[in-house]
Design a protein with these regions (language model features):
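Structured loop/turn residues at beta-strand edges in well-structured enzyme cores
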Residues: 2, 44, 106
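N-terminal beta1-alpha1 ligand-phosphate binding loop
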Residues: 2-27
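Structural beta-sheet core signal
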Residues: 5-6, 33, 51, 81-84, ...
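Acidic/glycine-enriched edge-of-secondary-structure segments
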Residues: 18-30, 48-58
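FMN-binding flavodoxin-like domain, especially the glycine-rich phosphate-binding loop
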Residues: 25, 29, 57-174
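A short, well-structured beta->alpha microelement
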Residues: 29-41
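A short, aliphatic-rich alpha-helical micro-motif
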Residues: 43-44, 75
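Structural motif
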Residues: 47-48, 79
Length: 174
């Protein structure tokens, strides 16, 4: 059975939650779950590497970008998959085009979106809290009449997408 590494970075905890949900669905497999800065994050000893991160202000969270840059040559020899969390899941394809090189995207067995969250209380800085509150209010208030915009919903973590991704991993790890 192949060894799987799930490596991620999180700022507000949403990516950690999603990574843990994925990990929990892989019982019976040899899986390591860790952050990008952990010693176990070295992908050399693994067959399959899953990299997760969030989109913040249109960019991949910096620790994940740094991890991809540092380990690019090693990752090129592995089966890799990616998951993102973002406030606007409908834009995930656009985000992947911006955050991965063409080669990274082509090599991936999956480019998934695990949804996202906009929870101002989880934000660390006052600026982030303010931006999240404005974005949530924009979605919920959406117009002059105060009704929720019909074309937008508050994002949540997608357990369905996580389950699909876990299914792919189970097949690959045989």
């Amino acid at each position: 059975m192949k060894k799987i590494l799930i490596v991620y970075a999180t700022k507000t905890g949403s990516t950690a939650t999603a990574a843990q949900l994925l990990y929990d669905r892989l019982t019976g497999r040899e899986v390591t779950l860790c952050t990008t800065d952990a010693p176990e994050a070295d992908p050399t000893a693994y067959d399959i590497v899953v990299i997760g991160g969030c989109i913040r202000y249109g960019k991949l969270y910096k620790p994940v970008r740094e991890y991809l840059q540092k380990w690019d040559a090693v990752l090129a020899e592995k089966q890799t998959g990616y998951f993102l969390l973002c406030g606007y899941p409908d834009s995930v394809e656009e985000y992947y085009e911006k955050v991965l090189t063409g080669e990274q995207a082509e090599r991936a067995f999956s480019l998934a979106c695990f949804g996202g969250e906009m929870v101002p209380a989880h934000a660390k800085s006052l600026w982030d809290k303010l931006v999240l509150k404005i974005e949530r209010d924009n979605i919920l208030g959406g117009g002059n009449n105060g009704d929720q915009r019909e074309d937008m919903v508050i994002p949540t973590i997608s357990e369905e997408n996580i389950a699909q991704f876990a299914g792919q991993l189970k097949q690959l790890s045989l």
